[in-house]
């Protein structure tokens, strides 16, 4: 006997919708709980089975917290700007807005079919002008505080496509689409000064309950380094340049220096005989992406400029080279090379026959770089010193001589905040003919994205907005002509603050009401993929800290607890993808097995954080368990089974209280697979009984409801209730019912186990000894022997020594 999920699930989804069951309560006498999913990009492909894993986890927590008497904020929305919609528009001539709306409608249908308890009244969409008005407002505040600025930045320019490409869209120097040549070209871009927040982004990781590996990824991305900035003079010139080094104590071993090919001094210092080689090398580098340039495994390339620098610590002349592995945007765009103690410098020196001088004792630098620690050698006043002392002494000397100073640098770069795209938030800036740049007045926000009948590349590297002359060209009241900014914001913009808008989604006066922000922040639990470890999570923390500084939000950090669900792989253990043909569509699973089965299966596959292969047999097993529950509790006619009575049943008492305690604890700690195991154990016990107390059945159904809400609502109705199960007080357990009143005793002869018995826990020593001697197996083993001694350890064992 089985239940009909095709009838039952739509019935309860309609009930929840009509009764607005999951509308966020804002009762001042209750605690608040904010459970957040990383909102999806509504792609044309729709949901895949990986999406519901994280969504089910937050839904279980949300449903449990409502039953535990909390106000629960559990919202959903759409991160709907982005490249795929624009690409679709360029390829088909269709409107990205219409395409996006269709995708959102499909995602909404799919999400509702899975029974998630979202408050749909709070739905947001990053492409809605009432939403992006506030994204633009935040940009304006950043600009006013000097944290948004323009800079010339090298981008991936594809002349054939007439557009700028992201690093991911470039493969081996060619565009992913069409295979056209791509060049590095400096272009005017908007930048956000995230580096101003580097220390706080680092230090405040201590305030949050996040996986340590994610914290480490952010720490490494920010990459705080302490060291010194050292000034080198160029021989026979007034020019100087600076390098940053974490090891100023190795300056005596610096035997050459390397510039990034884009360094501004190269043209000035290159000698006539090296000019041609330098120009050719620079052209070659233009075709390479940053990843290709810094690949440690590749052969080192470079070219000598013909110029020399003076090593400031010993006055030696050292050659100046250029090489692609030095990037202009990192540090100063120039490095001092100490080949004896750095692997990359060593390989470069070997390739080009440059001098290698050891300054630390240890290793054999004729064979490989020595990267360990040792006392200093060949280093004049630093000789004999260990690393820490030598660094301090070197910096002190540099500062005294006025040729260097202590410095902290970061690997973190400022955030490149503009895209040469149409489908994004317009940047609310006007460039005037007299050179002034102004913001669009706050009372004129949102600056609307104009409708375009055809989206096509501008051909100049600007976004397609540059083609819309009526929109771009403006005149102020004094007749001064200007051009609107044609770059748009990146997709990361809308997702950097969306969790704030859910708190007060219809506020037209502010991002959200201050009092409401104080009540709901920080987010209690945020669940999503680990792939967002550095970009989204770092950008959101940056914007949140900025909004904290200007008094908009009351907390330093946005997300108190973060959890990353694992990936659901294809049946062959490979990542699911269209090209592999192993993508599982949740619609098909819901049709065949039901949403409750899908939810149960995804939570029971294994630990939430593990990556696990999809398995059809596992789905069938999940459905069988739900059918087992149904058969136990419901008759063929659909009424409550006769074995469910109001009578007590001592045999089930301990199992029930143990289940309530364990399941509650495991749900709280996101250990859903082991929580479900406890539900299964209880059902196995219940099948062995002639009667099951109705109170226990109700408690069980409540514990089941966050996982399988449709089935739970149906069972709750069959149990005689007319209201939804969603707000019924969560079951409690009695600790005294968990105490064992019986205990297993091991019986031994001469220290070897011969038998085991179960006895009352309260049994005295003498009683235990008597029972042990009367045990049949013990009698067999003691036959013909004389008992010399009896050792009794109450609650554990009886050992009879005999010979």
Curated annotation (Swiss-Prot):
Catalytic activities: tRNA(Leu) + L-leucine + ATP = L-leucyl-tRNA(Leu) + AMP + diphosphate
Enzyme Commission number(s) of this protein: 6.1.1.4
EC main group: ligase
Gene Ontology cellular component annotations, sorted alphabetically: cytosol
Superkingdom in the source lineage: Bacteria
Keyword Nucleotide-binding: yes
Motif ('HIGH' region): 40-51
Annotated compartments: Cytoplasm
Motif ('KMSKS' region): 575-579
Keywords linked to the UniProt accession: Aminoacyl-tRNA synthetase, ATP-binding, Cytoplasm, Ligase, Nucleotide-binding, Protein biosynthesis
Single Gene Ontology BP annotation: leucyl-tRNA aminoacylation
Transmembrane portions of the chain: none
Keyword Hydrolase assigned: no
SUPFAM superfamilies: Anticodon-binding domain of a subclass of class I aminoacyl-tRNA synthetases (SSF47323), Nucleotidylyl transferase (SSF52374), ValRS/IleRS/LeuRS editing domain (SSF50677)
Xref: PANTHER family: LEUCINE--TRNA LIGASE, MITOCHONDRIAL, LEUCYL-TRNA SYNTHETASE
Family listed: Belongs to the class-I aminoacyl-tRNA synthetase family.
Designated name of the protein: Leucine--tRNA ligase
Species whose genome carries this gene: Listeria monocytogenes serotype 4b (strain CLIP80459)
């Amino acid at each position: 006997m089985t239940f009909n999920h095709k009838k039952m699930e739509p019935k309860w989804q309609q009930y929840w919708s009509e009764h607005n069951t999951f509308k966020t309560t804002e009762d001042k006498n209750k605690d608040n709980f904010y459970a957040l999913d990383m909102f999806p990009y509504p792609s044309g492909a729709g949901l895949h089975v990986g999406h519901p894993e994280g969504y089910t986890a937050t839904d279980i927590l949300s449903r449990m917290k409502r039953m535990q008497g909390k106000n629960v904020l559990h919202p959903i929305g759409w991160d709907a700007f982005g490249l795929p919609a624009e690409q679709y528009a360029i390829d088909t001539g269709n409107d990205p807005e219409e395409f996006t709306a269709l995708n959102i409608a499909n995602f909404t249908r799919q999400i509702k079919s899975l029974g998630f308890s979202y408050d749909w009244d709070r739905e947001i969409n990053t492409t809605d002008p009432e939403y992006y008005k506030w994204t633009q407002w935040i940009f304006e505040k950043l600009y006013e505080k000097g944290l948004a600025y323009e800079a010339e930045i090298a981008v991936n320019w594809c002349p054939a496509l007439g557009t700028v490409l992201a690093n991911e869209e470039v493969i081996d120097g060619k565009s992913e689409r069409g295979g056209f040549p791509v060049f590095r070209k400096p272009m005017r871009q908007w930048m956000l000064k995230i580096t101003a927040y580097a220390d706080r982004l680092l230090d405040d990781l201590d305030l949050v309950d996040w996986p340590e590996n994610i914290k480490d990824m952010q720490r490494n991305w920010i990459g705080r380094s302490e060291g010194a900035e050292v000034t080198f003079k160029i021989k026979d010139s007034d020019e100087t340049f600076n390098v940053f080094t974490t090891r100023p104590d190795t300056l005596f071993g610096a035997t050459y220096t390397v510039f990034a090919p884009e360094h501004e001094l190269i043209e000035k210092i290159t000698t006539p005989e090296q000019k041609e080689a330098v120009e050719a090398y620079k052209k070659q580098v233009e075709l390479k992406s940053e990843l290709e340039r810094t690949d440690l495994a590749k052969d080192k390339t470079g070219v000598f400029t013909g110029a020399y620098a003076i090593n400031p610590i010993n006055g030696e002349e050292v050659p100046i080279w250029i090489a692609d592995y030095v990037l202009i945007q990192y540090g100063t765009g120039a490095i001092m090379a100490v080949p004896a103690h750095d692997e990359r410098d060593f390989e470069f020196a070997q390739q080009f026959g440059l001098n290698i001088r050891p300054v630390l004792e240890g290793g054999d630098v004729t064979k490989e770089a020595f990267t360990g620690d040792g006392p200093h050698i060949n280093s004049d006043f630093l000789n004999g010193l260990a690393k820490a002392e030598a660094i301090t002494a070197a910096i002190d000397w540099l500062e005294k001589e006025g040729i260097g100073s202590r410095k902290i640098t970061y690997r973190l770069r400022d955030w490149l905040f503009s895209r040469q795209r149409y489908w994004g938030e317009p940047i609310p800036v006007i460039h005037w003919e007299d050179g002034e740049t102004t913001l669009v007045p706050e009372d004129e926000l949102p600056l609307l994205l104009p409708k375009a009948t055809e989206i096509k590349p501008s051909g100049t590297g600007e976004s397609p907005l540059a083609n819309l002359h009526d929109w771009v060209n403006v005149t102020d009241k004094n007749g001064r002509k200007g051009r609107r900014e044609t770059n748009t914001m990146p997709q990361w913009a809308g997702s950097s603050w969306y969790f704030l808008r859910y708190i007060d989604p219809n506020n037209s006066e502010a991002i959200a009401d201050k009092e409401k922000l104080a009540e709901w922040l920080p987010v209690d639990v945020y669940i999503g993929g680990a792939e967002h470890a550095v970009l989204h999570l770092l950008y959101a923390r940056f914007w949140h800290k900025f909004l904290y500084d200007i008094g908009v939000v009351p907390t330093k950090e946005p997300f108190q607890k973060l959890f990353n669900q694992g990936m659901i792989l294809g049946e062959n253990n490979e990542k699911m993808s269209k090209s592999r043909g192993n993508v599982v569509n949740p619609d098909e699973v819901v049709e065949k097995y039901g949403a409750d089965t899908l939810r149960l299966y995804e939570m029971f596959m294994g630990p939430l954080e593990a990556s696990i292969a999809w398995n059809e047999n596992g789905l069938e097993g999940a459905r069988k368990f739900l059918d087992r529950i149904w058969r136990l509790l419901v008759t063929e006619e659909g009424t409550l089974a006769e074995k469910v009575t109001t009578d007590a049943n001592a045999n089930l008492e301990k199992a029930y209280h143990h289940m309530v305690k364990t399941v509650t604890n495991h749900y709280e700690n996101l250990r859903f697979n082991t929580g479900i195991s406890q539900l299964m154990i209880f059902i196995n016990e219940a099948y062995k009984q002639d009667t099951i107390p109705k109170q226990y059945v109700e408690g069980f159904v409540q514990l089941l409801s966050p996982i399988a809400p449709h089935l739970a609502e149906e069972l709750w109705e069959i149990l005689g209730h007319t209201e939804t199960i969603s707000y019924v007080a969560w079951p409690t357990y009695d600790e005294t019912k968990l105490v064992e009143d019986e205990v297993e005793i091991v019986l031994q002869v001469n220290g070897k186990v011969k038998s085991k018995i179960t006895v009352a826990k309260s049994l005295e020593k003498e009683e235990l000894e008597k029972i042990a001697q009367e045990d049949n197996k013990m009698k067999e083993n003691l036959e013909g022997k004389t008992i010399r001694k009896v050792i009794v350890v109450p609650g554990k064992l009886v050992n009879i020594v005999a010979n």
